[in-house]
Amino acid sequence: MNKKIHSLALLVNLGIYGVAQAQEPTDTPVSHDDTIVVTAAEQNLQAPGVSTITADEIRKNPVARDVSEIIRTMPGVNLTGNSTSGQRGNNRQIDIRGMGPENTLILIDGKPVSSRNSVRQGWRGERDTRGDTSWVPPEMIERIEVLRGPAAARYGNGAAGGVVNIITKKGSGEWHGSWDAYFNAPEHKEEGATKRTNFSLTGPLGDEFSFRLYGNLDKTQADAWDINQGHQSARAGTYATTLPAGREGVINKDINGVVRWDFAPLQSLELEAGYSRQGNLYAGDTQNTNSDAYTRSKYGDETNRLYRQNYSLTWNGGWDNGVTTSNWVQYEHTRNSRIPEGLAGGTEGKFNEKAAQDFVDIDLDDVMLHSEVNLPIDFLVNQTLTLGTEWNQQRMKDLSSNTQALTGTNTGGAIDGVSATDRSPYSKAEIFSLFAENNMELTDSTIVTPGLRFDHHSIVGNNWSPALNISQGLGDDFTLKMGIARAYKAPSLYQTNPNYILYSKGQGCYASAGGCYLQGNDDLKAETSINKEIGLEFKRDGWLAGVTWFRNDYRNKIEAGYVAVGQNAVGTDLYQWDNVPKAVVEGLEGSLNVPVSETVMWTNNITYMLKSENKTTGDRLSIIPEYTLNSTLSWQAREDLSMQTTFTWYGKQQPKKYNYKGQPAVGPETKEISPYSIVGLSATWDVTKNVSLTGGVDNLFDKRLWRAGNAQTTGDLAGANYIAGAGAYTYNEPGRTWYMSINTHF
């Protein structure tokens, strides 16, 4: 970033202006002279691509491992990997509208979370990570907002698919506390069980001060090392005894505190500090499902640990004239400590038994400054102008991922201009952004919200993101909502780092018969997507029905390159991370909520994918169901007793069409997952005004899937050593599981 832009970023972010990016909406709008001020951020929450999960819904349908389990029941949302490879198949993360987990921005109280970026991206773009949706205990969540399409694009870098904003429960001026516990019992003993307990305490610290404190401890056991025995893809020779792994376990420890100072009417300062530790319990997974005696010996051990620290200072202000502002700075440090892994061919992602250290650290520092101001304007029409800015810096020190040797055995020889063994472990990038939106109420039934965002990235340069959202009432019951926006995602610190190099002896190379390298590329372009949607909504007397068409025209998606950019002295081809010119995602979302009676509510949503295509290769972008139907029937049987039934129906899942060399998938690589459904039952009893119990069963009819391997064949099926491809059978669907939770509060 040049000095002028850098200086401007620092000055503006000291609080002169404000950014509307990623801000948690205030609990109540500011009113002045009987005029309600509605900001663009709040108006976007009314877009067709927005859903909300409440604390009560989480209480009545408690999650086991991760809140992604309930987020996936929203329209347009599924769980998948970053590609069609099936690698790390059981570490599926949130995918919104088929754009992949890397294009889903995770926020906690409006502030981005970036810990998963400390995990290395493999050749196919996968990370060995559980994602960033488990840093807050489910019982500490007030609500979760899921934004899709144009409504999400306003949040800038990483939101091309959508945004998940996890909003925590707040403190108050009165003393309150809670203690919660959850445990489950899988019917199949080879599946890992979960136990969780947490507490919270809020209260006053004098007339102007208050606080909130929570702590959490949970443990999920790893699936048995042989859970997929008998379901693995065909394997021969040196791979004959290998097995694809089940779901890994995890131990979470969290502590978080906030002190709030209400120093004047409508003015507050909040200081937050948090610490989390997540350690996995190894289930036997390797990137290429080629386990050996050493990897099997690590079963049940912690093989990677994430230590996350976050600190933030927030100033929220309002004035009698309706002007509001929100300004905050956040520092997030993640230490990713893990067993060293191989970086070449079949050993990529496999524990390196000969490494000099038992564990190596990857340290990621993320500093973010945000500022926003909302200005009500009474000129021609009622409108609220939002102006803002943002500055973000990421710095990483990776002592492991830049160590692929370029000389000696299992290498492809030296690369001109690149050190063979002593490459820098450091990388960094900065983004400076300016932001403007105007929420205009043209008539009582017509709202227009134009917006414009500018981002300057220190490596890939400038990006402009215009947006336009329109809401038009059609009589008393119908509303037509439309939006179009240009979304944006900068490349990762791995993709732009020339010191990050992977090696393959040939099978992983797109157009090379022999060995090849894949190198980071500091000449990449940012990914962009033109996101469009049109939705029609009907509301009357508790009924709600809607249908939305969406299309994302995806440009410059970053993948491992398809064309060698050079060759070294010994004939090894050099590939780089590269931009795919065009891809497209298109689909339909529908919803239907029916008040069956005063005590019974039936809610439904469906997502149908029309297109998911890389226009360069013709391949799919990810493995997701053709359609997903979520249905919940809720019955308030008594004032203190509620029951619900959940039903999810997944359409067929098709695997990748082509292998890594661009050749059509054949044989077992073409296996599809047929449609299947999952049914759940639960009941919640409010024992007293301070105690409630929830019990239930997930997957009532015990529909299970087993991970058979990665999507593509490793080796030659006609040869002596191979692992056959698994097609779409790259993850485990757990069977019938009983659970219970207790929630207490005072």
Per-region residue spans from a language model:
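Surface-exposed extracellular loop regions of Gram-negative outer-membrane beta-barrel proteins
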Residues: G279-L281, S458-V460, D476-K532, W549-Y575, ...
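N-terminal periplasmic "start-of-domain" segments of outer-membrane beta-barrel proteins
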Residues: H32-A64, S68, Q93, S118-E126
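A beta-strand signature from Gram-negative outer-membrane beta-barrel systems
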Residues: D128-D180, H745
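Transmembrane beta-barrel wall of Gram-negative outer-membrane proteins
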Residues: E190-N280, Y307-Q309, F379
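C-terminal beta-signal and adjacent terminal beta-strands/loops
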Residues: S114-N117, R555, W649-Y658, T684-F746
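Gram-negative outer-membrane beta-barrel transporters
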Residues: D180, E441-S445, W549-Y554, V565, ...
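Extracytoplasmic beta-strand/coil segments of soluble accessory domains associated
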Residues: S68-R116
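Outer membrane beta-barrel strand-and-loop segments of large Gram-negative receptors
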Residues: D366-L375, R423-S427, S433, N521-K525, ...
